[in-house]
Amino acid sequence: MASLAESKTRAALSPDSTPDPKIPKRVPSKFIACDAWGGAEAIVKKALSHYNFPLKTLTNDNLTGVKEADIVLLSCKPQGAQGILGAEGIQAALAGKVLVSILAGVTVAQLERYLYPKNMSSGLPENACRIVRVMPNTASFVRESMSVIEISTPPLTDDQHALVSFIFSSIGRVVSLPAANMDVSTALCGSGPAFFALMLEAAADGAVAMGLPRAEAQLMAAQTMRGTTGLVLNGEHPAVLKDKVSTPGGCTIGGLMVLEEAAVRGAIARTIREATVVASQLGQGATNVNGTRH
């Protein structure tokens, strides 16, 4: 998760970003990176040093970073959230600010319990921070992320929403969905790159088995997948696209029959369903959840 935070910071700093058309009144102009690992400072500085924006790195000092920030990005492991938010002084330092969480499976309600454990029976304090849940993915490194912003209740102010959208539009595309859709969004968008990478690798393996050099096979598979997604994003329905390529008696329909006989369609759909359940369980603090279903 640290790499995701680094890539989002890198993209937000970039002048080549393509943000949401609605520009917030204030945009990020200074960046503070907090990490518990001493070696992270050198990595962050190396990754972001060529951007002409102030950058400050802190090790084992989240409190100072939160105090100095207007908007805070929480990008630790899900199981580390309670310790970070429950640390002395963090609640006061976050008062009136926006906290953006990219933790898989962890709900806004859970984060509120970690941050305000003494207030849950009587309600949140008036100066409570606004917690926003967002699910980006690793393609943020190349500004091709698919980020899902949870629709907050009550809604964010116009400027808060514009700021969060601006930040994540800088690293790719953004959609807003209700809280009930966040676990499946984690499975499809957060875990999706790994699933699609496996499919891409399998296609390249098949081509290598039939004589293509590895480098060319990987390039061809990646570009073919990229071109296909481009057509879909341009409005082409996947089923229509598939049929357009499938001439009667041709090699495409022959290959598709192998996929259908192997129930690949159902396996891929089940992959998303399984990952959704796992994301939900991880957010509740469960362990070894991948060994509980068959």
Task: Mark where each language-model region is.
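Rossmann-like NAD(P)(H) cofactor-binding subdomain of soluble oxidoreductases
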Residues: 24, 32, 38, 43-44, ...
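Internal alpha-helical scaffold of NAD(P)-dependent oxidoreductase catalytic cores
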Residues: 110-130, 146-184, 196-234, 278
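Short pre-catalytic strand/loop immediately N-terminal to key active-site residues, enriched for Gly-Thr
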Residues: 132, 182-187, 238-243
